[in-house]
Amino acid sequence: MIILGFESSCDETGVAAVSTERGLLAHALHTQIAMHQEYGGVVPELASRDHIRRAVPLARQVLAEAGLGLQDVDAVAYTAGPGLAGALLVGASVAQAFAWARGLPAIPIHHLEGHLLSPLLDDPRPDFPFVALLVSGGHTQLMRVDGVGRYALLGETLDDAAGEAFDKSAKLMGLGYPGGPALSRLAASGDPRRYALPRPMLHSGDLDFSFSGLKTAVLTRVKEAERDGGLDDAARADLAAATQAAIVEVLVAKAVRALKQTGLKRLVVAGGVGANQLLRELLAQALRPLGARAYFPPLALCTDNGAMIAFAAAERVKAGLASLQAGQHAFTVRPRWDLADICAGTPA
């Protein structure tokens, strides 16, 4: 079975073709970073308009690269939420139009489930059960995953996501947009010991997170530097390194605690922050004494992408959790959508 998947929840337009038997066949991605840079962040209306321009050409590109025609597609999948309402509606409309034209089923997919399952696209594929660390600009959660559609929340951020802490801290340092990757690049040349920053909830004993206090601490350091003439290049690099070290230390500690509490030996890390090299290195070090292992999606699939949506749909089909009835062309999207809502075992 071949599924054509569409992702349009924020500022990336992604399309992919996945086979339930052969895996990922082709995928294409367009990022809107250049368009949003002058505004310092994502402008929802501009994002929606760009998705309209990109979705169909990307679909044609994917089909051509996979050597497929529309007649070869058996189902269509799309991100139904969470995300920006207008952006989600574009992806849903395009996917539903493809489905209607060919009389195919259209499968709505939860954006976070796409991220959560994306490391299964790579080899070696982790077996169930495992602990998942979902860490991005909008979400920071620890989940126990016992199978497709079988997710239990272990802990989550009580305020800001880790990715937001990266992005907002970078903006405070004048690093531009997108801030997280810029901060990580600058941190490579900095000394994290120069600035003492808090590790919020590091010793709380639970698996929840909080990053708002860290952002406030970074703001305080920036204002202190401004009173003395501002951050020079060395100080900016050191503050970036200290910020990254604080975020990563908390993520690693909570992930290790989750493995110990569950007794599991496999950790799946997904979401944009999963591309962070320091996080990957320190997790590998921390898990080694436990006899545990971390699994990451390929770097190209850490950001939002169509491959994870098509793949999540394929996994739901194989698990009997997706309706394959054609002719159900609802345009409902859910900008706010709890992952727990899809864990009851009913078709999406």
From Swiss-Prot:
Q: Which GO terms describe its cellular component?
A: cytoplasm
Question: What cofactor does its activity depend on?
Answer: Fe(2+)
Species this chain originates from: Bordetella petrii (strain ATCC BAA-461 / DSM 12804 / CCUG 43448)
The UniProt family comment states: Belongs to the KAE1 / TsaD family.
Reactions that this protein is recorded to catalyse: L-threonylcarbamoyladenylate + adenosine(37) in tRNA = N(6)-L-threonylcarbamoyladenosine(37) in tRNA + AMP + H(+)
What is the name of the gene encoding this protein? Answer: tsaD
> Which sites bind Fe cation?
111, 115, 304
Tell me which InterPro entries the record gives.
Answer: ATPase_NBD, Gcp-like_dom, KAE1/TsaD, TsaD
> What is the stated purpose of this protein?
Required for the formation of a threonylcarbamoyl group on adenosine at position 37 (t(6)A37) in tRNAs that read codons beginning with adenine. Is involved in the transfer of the threonylcarbamoyl moiety of threonylcarbamoyl-AMP (TC-AMP) to the N6 group of A37, together with TsaE and TsaB. TsaD likely plays a direct catalytic role in this reaction.
PANTHER family named in the record = TRNA N6-ADENOSINE THREONYLCARBAMOYLTRANSFERASE, TRNA N6-ADENOSINE THREONYLCARBAMOYLTRANSFERASE, MITOCHONDRIAL
Lineage, opening ranks: Bacteria, Pseudomonadati, Pseudomonadota, Betaproteobacteria, Burkholderiales
A biological-process GO annotation: tRNA threonylcarbamoyladenosine modification
Protein's recorded name: tRNA N6-adenosine threonylcarbamoyltransferase
Superkingdom, natural source: Bacteria
